[in-house]
């Protein structure tokens, strides 16, 4: 079965609202073996909606819409779908009573605008909406299926999970399962080169790399007639990829790098403190996102000036004068200084030139040093990046977390 997701709402086109519905529905459809061929976003305009429906059904069996089911005049999805399927809209008394009951919960009375929400194509299956006043519906005709859902995610998602998925599962006999591997320390092109044999020979499962800031994700996707069979197809490919990429894979699924690092620290009861210059607290902020980190994260210092590095971290004035603040020597003294000051097993530091100003020939914008102190041992890493200030700061935090992860292995 081929599907298109059609999200309706002028507010989406204007960028006032982020379209999370398409992402959610795509993932859910993939899990039950339905392939999504196209995403569309369209404003609240009946003629355009009709044209989009006609275009979509030229190559799809299934079109799922979200939005345009509200009580206002510009909510036209229901009317457009009814016209496309040549169906009259009729009042559904049960829905009318449910809408009225819902409105009473908010001390509101039924209006003609709300009454409009209780009209549906004559031949359709109505999907109750316990979270709002806009029921959805399913209409089938001439081998075409349209599933019409409300726009707000808190209304759409429960309806999709409880009503739409059971309906669709009866129509398909295949399952698609995916496994996501998260990779850092090497770029997308390096990943593609290392697993080129797998990428060139892929059929089922498929393997697709995706570049993100500071990391690459690999999605392994298998299609089979059962979940167990799909998983069994993924396992040998995943094993081979792990053998090739090794420690560059830091997690799978939704687990983020900071969560991996925080878990290691908590499980091994390793206390940590951070000393940041160019990242200005971003590194500490990432770590403290993790619940339970308070048992091991003792302190974070932002030491932006040379004076604060000397006074707060005990960085030697001579080191700063000889090597400058952007140097491996200062990064190491910062890491050791914060660890000893805070009394922690680990100290980690960042110093560099994030830009847009401050760069020199010897110390260009994007030159970064990460210092690391672990129970008396010191490590340092030099990085060179190009990009804007925010990118350089964010990538530095990612590399610092990964540097710590690898040295704790």
Swiss-Prot record:
Q: Which residues cross the membrane?
A: none
Pfam families for this protein: CinA (PF02464), CinA_KH (PF18146), MoCF_biosynth (PF00994)
What InterPro entries has UniProt attached to this entry? CinA, CinA-like_C, CinA_C, CinA_KH, Competence-induced_CinA, MoaB/Mog-like_dom_sf, MoaB/Mog_dom
Instruction: Check the record and name the SMART domains matching this protein.
Output: MoCF_biosynth
- Highest taxon, organism lineage: Bacteria
- Family of this protein: Belongs to the CinA family.
Read off the HAMAP family from this record: CinA_B
Q: Know the name of this protein?
A: Putative competence-damage inducible protein
Lineage of producing organism: Bacteria, Bacillati, Bacillota, Clostridia, Eubacteriales
């Amino acid at each position: 079965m081929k599907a298109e997701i059609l999200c309706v709402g002028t507010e989406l086109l204007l960028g006032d609202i982020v379209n999370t519905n398409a992402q959610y529905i795509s993932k859910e459809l993939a899990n039950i073996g339905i392939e999504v061929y196209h995403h569309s976003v369209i404003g609240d305009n009946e003629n355009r909606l009709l044209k989009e429906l006609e275009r979509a059904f030229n190559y799809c069996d299934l079109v799922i819409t979200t939005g345009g089911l509200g009580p206002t005049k510009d909510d036209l999805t229901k009317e457009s779908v009814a016209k496309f399927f040549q169906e009259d809209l009729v009042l559904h008394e049960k829905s009318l009573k449910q809408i009225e009951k819902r409105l009473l919960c908010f001390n509101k009375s039924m209006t003609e605008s709300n009454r409009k929400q209780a009209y549906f194509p004559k031949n359709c299956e109505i999907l109750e909406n316990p979270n709002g006043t806009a029921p959805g519906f399913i209409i089938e005709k001439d081998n075409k299926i349209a599933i019409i859902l409300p726009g707000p995610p808190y209304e759409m998602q429960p309806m999709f999970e409880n009503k739409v998925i059971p309906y669709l599962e009866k129509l398909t006999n295949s399952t698609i399962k995916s496994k996501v591997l998260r990779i850092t320390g090497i770029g997308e092109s390096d990943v593609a080169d290392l697993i080129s044999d797998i990428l060139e020979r892929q059929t089922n499962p498929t393997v697709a790399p995706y570049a993100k800031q500071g990391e690459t994700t690999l999605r392994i996707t298998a299609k089979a007639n059962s979940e167990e069979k799909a998983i069994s197809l993924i396992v040998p490919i995943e094993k081979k990829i792990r053998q090739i990429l090794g420690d560059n894979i830091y997690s799978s699924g939704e687990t983020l790098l900071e969560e991996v690092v925080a878990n290691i620290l908590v499980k091994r009861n390793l206390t940590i403190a951070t000393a940041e210059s160019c990242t200005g607290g971003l590194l500490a902020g990432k770590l403290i996102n993790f619940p339970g980190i308070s048992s091991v994260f003792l302190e974070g210092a932002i030491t932006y000036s040379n004076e604060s590095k000397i006074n707060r971290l005990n960085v030697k004035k001579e080191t700063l004068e000889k090597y400058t603040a952007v140097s491996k020597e200062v990064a190491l003294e910062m890491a050791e200084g914060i660890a000893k000051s805070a009394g922690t097993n680990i100290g980690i530091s960042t110093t560099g030139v994030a830009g847009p100003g401050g760069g020199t020939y010897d110390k260009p914008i994007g030159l970064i040093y990460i210092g690391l102190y672990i129970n008396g041992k010191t490590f340092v890493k030099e990085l060179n990046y190009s990009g804007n200030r925010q990118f350089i700061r964010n990538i530095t935090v990612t590399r610092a977390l990964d540097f710590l992860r690898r040295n704790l292995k």
